[in-house]
């Protein structure tokens, strides 16, 4: 109820370009406030989804502390007005996520997934620290308010943006994401897809202002890599037999369009990327919840065993349909608004993007339908010896993902 009331604050309050300061180092604008609200929303739903941890009593108090620590670090990342604090909390937010994956993941491979996550992110974030020191020497400030410079250096741009490309993730530096998603518990997958990937997009929105000349010169290369990578990853989605891996790769495909929109460096592109980040956060988190609900029943994430769910839990297949249709950007979901804005931005930037964008949208629909058709239709797994229907908690959890996803499309005018 408190979160619903807080969301009403967005609808009634007029956010300008300025920050609303809470202190010298903490403040909010529309972008950071929306992502803070998304963090609170997803972290609340994470606890609701992790019923098995509370029932089994497997270090449930430690789990709650971990989630709260993660929420606090995310709040401080999004509300930080100082670049050094932003960098500090950006790195700190990795620690509770690593604990969630290694502590409550199901398979022994979770250790390897933790290594992938840490090494990719930490290796990419070291150049950013060098850039921050250089920035402080040049400007004598690390406050967002005073960063009115334009660095015309490709090397500095790569130092700064590499960590955000890894976090988003961009194609070629995305290999840690499917690994982490597949091995993470449901709470880890939800927060990773819902909020952690948005740190990459948020960082780019904040920092690209410093490199407007570099982005205008070399943006075409990164847009090309993003869109081509998104198409290749969408083809990979159609070859998956693991539900969580398919949803994880679809996240890479969606975020590639967000990256391309940001690199087009237009106002519509920024708005589209922002809308798509919020929509993708709610939609992919809901899909991971659905995959986990099936996993708890069947005991496997394989699409070959999770078949014929329409015969077993017909009421759950409605939710599968709603989330798969939202994932393919069908109306009235927020994904549609984001995709329209991003396609408008990228086509106006270069008409040659039409082919790749058309292919990306078509394949998005293809793998969403593939996921729905495979899980709901066909003959159900003959090895099932007992099966129980959905709980009210699970339907509420899915409704709390779907409702804001389709309600916020009516508030598309706050740009």
Task: List the model feature ranges, each with a label.
Residues 1-415:
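Core, highly hydrophobic multi-pass alpha-helical transmembrane subunits of bioenergetic inner membranes
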């Amino acid at each position: 109820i408190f979160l619903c009331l807080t969301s009403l604050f967005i609808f009634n309050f007029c956010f300008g370009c300025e920050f609303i300061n809470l202190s010298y180092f903490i403040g909010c604008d529309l972008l950071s406030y929306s992502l803070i609200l998304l963090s609170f929303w997803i972290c609340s739903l994470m606890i609701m989804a992790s019923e098995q941890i509370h029932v089994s009593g497997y270090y449930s108090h430690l789990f709650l502390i971990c989630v709260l620590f993660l929420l606090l670090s995310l709040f401080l990342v999004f509300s930080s007005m100082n670049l050094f604090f932003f960098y500090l909390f950006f790195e700190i937010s990795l620690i509770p996520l690593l604990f969630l994956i290694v502590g409550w993941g199901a398979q022994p491979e979770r250790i390897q997934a933790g290594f992938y996550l840490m090494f990719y992110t930490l290796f990419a974030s070291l150049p950013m620290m060098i850039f921050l020191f250089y920035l402080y020497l040049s400007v004598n400030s690390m406050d967002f308010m005073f960063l009115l410079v334009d660095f015309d250096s490709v090397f500095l741009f790569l130092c700064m943006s590499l960590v955000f490309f890894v976090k988003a993730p961009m194609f070629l530096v995305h290999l840690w994401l499917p690994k982490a998603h597949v091995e993470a518990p449901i709470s880890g997958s939800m927060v990773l897809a819902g909020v952690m990937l948005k740190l990459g997009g948020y960082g780019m929105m904040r920092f690209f202002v410093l490199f407007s000349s570099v982005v205008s010169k070399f943006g075409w290369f990164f847009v090309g890599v993003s869109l081509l990578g998104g198409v290749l990853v969408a083809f990979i989605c159609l070859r998956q037999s693991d539900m969580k891996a398919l949803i994880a790769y679809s996240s890479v495909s969606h975020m590639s369009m967000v990256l391309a929109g940001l690199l087009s460096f237009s106002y519509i592109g920024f708005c589209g990327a922002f809308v798509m980040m919020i929509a993708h956060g709610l939609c992919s988190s809901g899909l991971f919840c659905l995959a986990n609900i099936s996993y708890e029943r069947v005991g496997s994430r394989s699409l070959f065993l999770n078949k014929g769910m329409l015969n077993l839990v017909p009421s759950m297949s409605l939710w599968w349909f709603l989330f798969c249709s939202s994932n393919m950007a069908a109306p009235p979901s927020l994904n549609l608004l984001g995709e329209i804005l991003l396609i408008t931005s990228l086509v106006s930037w270069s008409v040659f993007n039409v082919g790749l964008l058309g292919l990306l949208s078509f394949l998005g629909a293809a793998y969403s339908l593939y996921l729905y058709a495979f899980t709901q239709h066909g003959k159900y797994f003959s090895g099932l010896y007992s099966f129980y229907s959905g709980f009210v908690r699970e339907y509420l959890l899915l409704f709390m993902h779907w409702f804001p996803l389709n309600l916020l499309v009516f508030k598309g005018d706050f740009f």
